[in-house]
Amino acid sequence: MKRFFFLCAVMAMAFTASAQQSWVNETYNPQANTEGLAPMGARVISPEVHDNHTVTFRLVAPNAQKVVVRGTMFTGGMEAKSAEMTKDDKGVWSVTAGPFTPDVYTYTFNVDGLSIVDPANTLHNHGTMPASSMLYVHGDGPAYYDPNPNVEHGSVTTSYYNSTVTGGLRTILVYTPPHYDPAKKYPVLYLMGGSGEAADSWYKYGQVNWIMDNLIAEGKIEPTIVAMVNNQIVHRSSPNHSQLSFKMMEREYKECIIPWVDSHYSTITNRKGRALSGLSMGGRHTQYIGFRNPELFGSLGILSAALTAADEKAFGEDAVAMGRDAKALKDAAFDYIFIG
């Protein structure tokens, strides 16, 4: 189970996108634009990522008065810093910024006070909040979160189940490792996203399938099933989100998710065969559900899970229940990791 430590730490650094600019091959440098071709319907190439790790951004906006690009590549925060763009005589705004550390970032254009995605960039994230554009600053070769043509690859399946908690149809994505064999038993990592993310975010932007393929090929983890769970169980803007979300997700796991996964895949069905992890809100769900249910999970990965005042209140209301289970927690001997 200690291998889950390594897996969770790796995934915490890799919330990235999995599509590509050219739509031809899965590659580690999808925005290098080696062919010099703009996407169909676009008038400019943007972003254009250069081998020296600088990036050229372009936007056609002849009537705009001011355009800036804002993104996580500058400081790690969307609004903290920006690069002002200049307009040429054809109405094309541009700026070359960087060099940036090879990684995956998000950015937007601000046009006269209006925030928009890059219309020439085919890679956008999506979820339960406004979209932004994805930026790949590639290194000299594939990173641990990139597709690698030299390793074997698993599969990702999108499925649906009926929830007794929400009373509706819910989405779940499941990664199975290369050469998945129903005659064998596999450990399961249950993985959740943050408050603004969709059910498929860990697949499309976290690239968990590439990460798993690479780690399995390197022998750093055993072949593992990953169940990517939709933890958007209450509308994020609901004033009762924190009070309802934790208990509802706990029920969802116990009544729906774990029984569904165990009945559809060849799994190890004891706590040592299950790990629970999540980013941000998913980390808070992990902390709440995992420590309250030590009989279900043997490993926990709590990633960037700062508690809000409302979260603390929700946790506090269950302090008696958690105290009641103190002996169970002591006997459980969790493997767990906190990051960020």
Regions found by a protein language model. Name each.
Residues 1-22:
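Bacterial Sec-dependent N-terminal signal peptides
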Residues 20-38, 43-80, 87-340:
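Non-catalytic cap/lid and distal C-terminal segments of serine-dependent acyl enzymes
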